[in-house]
C-alpha cells in the first residue's frame, strides 16, 4: 500500500482518509522500510497534507496507541503542534491547570521539546512530576485529581517504526502534526495551537472527522501557536459539526495588549518558575495569555458560555488557589504511586 501511496502523491493526487489510514497502518506495524517511509514523508510534505489525510493518519495512530479510560463525558486537552519557534514559556500546559482548577477534566497530552528549549514534559519534570508513571497511575490521577499528563512516548510505541526515517530525513512531516489529534484518553474538547495560519481550518476539519465535540484551533498573527495577547489570533472553531474561522482581538477581550518579549521563556527551570508564579497569582501579560487560552478551553468544554464569563472563571481558578492546588496534587500523586 505504501508504494501505491507514494506513486499517487508524487502525481499530486490526494489520498482518501481510508488510503492514508492503510499506509500509516503499514508504517506503524513495522512493515514499511525506512526508504519507503522517508520517500512517503517527503512526497507528502511537498504535495501538502489535506485534512482527510491528517484524519486518516490520526485514526490509525489512535488505534495503535495504548489507551486509558476516563469516565468523564467531557475531556479537555490543550496540546498543540509546537514548532512556532517563538521561545515563549509553556502557555498551554500552564493553562491546563487553570482549566482543571475550574472542575473540568483535563488529559494533557505532550512530549519533550523538539524545537524549543522546553516542551510540556520538560516543564512538568522540572516542576517535580514523574513522567514515567504507569498508565494506570495517570488514569487514576485524572479520575481523582481531575488532571493527568499523558507522556507521548509511553502511549505511542508504534511510532518507533518511523523514528529512524524521521531522524535521517530531518524535516518537518505529518508525524509532527499528529500529537494533538491522538490523545490516548480520547479528549473530545480541545484548544489546539498550530505553527502556521493555513493549518487552522485543516486541523479543525480533521477534528470534525475524528468526532471532536468542540475545539478552537488557533494561530496568532505574531506567529504564536496559542491565542495571543500581542496580536489578533486566527481561530477555526469546531462546534456542532461545523467549522467557522474568524479573528480574536486580545484588546477586546482583555482591554489591553502585550509585547512579545513579555511572554519569553527559557530552559525548564526558568519556565517552571514562570508557571508557579502565574498559578500563584502573579499579574501581567503572562497571566493574561494563560487566562485567555484557559478561557477558550472552558468554552470548548461547555463550562462557560463565552469569553467574558470564561475569563472570569479562569481568573477565579488562579486567585482562589485552585489551579496551583491541581499542580501540587498531580506532582504529589505521580511520585507517591
UniProtKB/Swiss-Prot annotation:
Requisite cofactors? Mg(2+)
Binding sites annotated in the UniProt record for anthranilate 2:
166
Q: Which GO terms describe its biological process?
A: L-tryptophan biosynthetic process
Q: How is the cofactor bound?
A: Binds 2 magnesium ions per monomer.
Q: Which domain of life is it from?
A: Bacteria
Any idea which positions bind Mg(2+) 1?
92, 226
Which amino acids does the record list as binding anthranilate 1?
80, 111
Any one GO MF annotation of this record: magnesium ion binding
- How does the record describe its quaternary structure? Homodimer.
* Name of the protein in its database record: Anthranilate phosphoribosyltransferase
Q: Tell me what organism the protein belongs to.
A: Syntrophobacter fumaroxidans (strain DSM 10017 / MPOB)
